[in-house]
Amino acid sequence: MADFYQNGIVTTLHNLENRSVEALESELNEFAKKRPLGLILPSLFSELEGKALPATIDHIAKVPYLNEVVIGLDRATKEQYQYALKFFSHLPQQHRVLWNDGPRLQALDEELRKLGLAPKELGKGRNVWYCMGFVLASNRVESVALHDCDILTYDRSLLARLIYPVANPQFNYEFCKGFYARVADGKINGRVSRLLVTPLLRALKHTLGQNDYLEFMDSFRYPLAGEFSFRRDVLNDIRIPSDWGLEIGVLSEMHRNYSHNRLCQSDIADAYDHKHQDLSLNNDQGGLSKMSIDITKALFRKLATQGTVFNTETFRTIKATYFRIALDFIETYHNDAVMNGLKLDIHSEEKAVELFAKNIMKAGTSFLDNPMETPFIPSWNRVVSAKPDVLECLLRAVEEDHKEFLGQ
């Protein structure tokens, strides 16, 4: 049972009564008559062969209020794309699969690259960006949710609670961030959020002083959750990172573009588990190690745009302050786990904190060495300005792929 406490400066919508999914969907059906609703699913082909996504699609097939489902498919051959078309074919909703590795979308990507407007890195950010473009191009929905495809505990109530705040015409929210407790198999998970992001935000407050952005970011209960929902207009202006800083980058864009009362977070699940990344102690180009560097750089970049001046001494102070705060958090999480009959390995927690502390310095050094680094993908408004027919080209490429390969 959740409490009703409002922390920070972003509205929190709680799960106070465990309201039935049928009751939520009944209202969403009515909302969808005036404000059509959609869903974006960024996926790797490998996820089609896993345990999570097939079960997720079975749930989504029962969702009555969706007008469109847009699936972004990465790392797929032609045969795998054809398999994906069949895999998603039992969805009763209007749906399309973006074959991101196919020749038509690759040709469009090359056109944008020549204009300096294509995503620079492969990954979830690029996948999500093209899916957002397709939502704009198809013009079928007014509000859209986005969630990952590796959720092992998926239930369609998650989607209902995620999209409800931007679907209800009596609410004025432009954006909703999902949150949940990362507890599974008798353990507390979510190491990067618990042991990096929250203590780093607190360390930045101590080091740099209070500012609106840090207060905003620290208001989110699970800032790294991959579940969002938006009003359609948001998709035109948002600039998202193509690296592991995606979730932090999206929140930063919401802070830049909208007042706090247009944003909210919603409790979307009692239980949540998905695939876990390796800590990658000896490889800062993979796993949670690379993730921690990219996330930290995303925070530094945002603060720099607000006038914060960084140097090596600043980063050393931030790192030292972070380290002390993070170690204190380990004791807090351990006591919370013990009281709830859960396990928490203090040794592995401290190893993670030590790695993250080192990576704060690596992120700071990279930030100073590459001051012109711009991992952001351009907004769709900018792309349309440079290539006015880009959305029509994107829509045509996806539809032609669908028509050519669906029956083969």
Region locations from a protein language model:
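N-proximal low-complexity "stem/linker" segments adjacent to membrane-targeting elements
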Residues: 1-62
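Short beta-strand-to-loop acidic/aromatic patch adjacent to the donor-nucleotide binding site
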Residues: 138-152
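Active-site donor/metal-binding and catalytic loop motifs
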Residues: 264-285
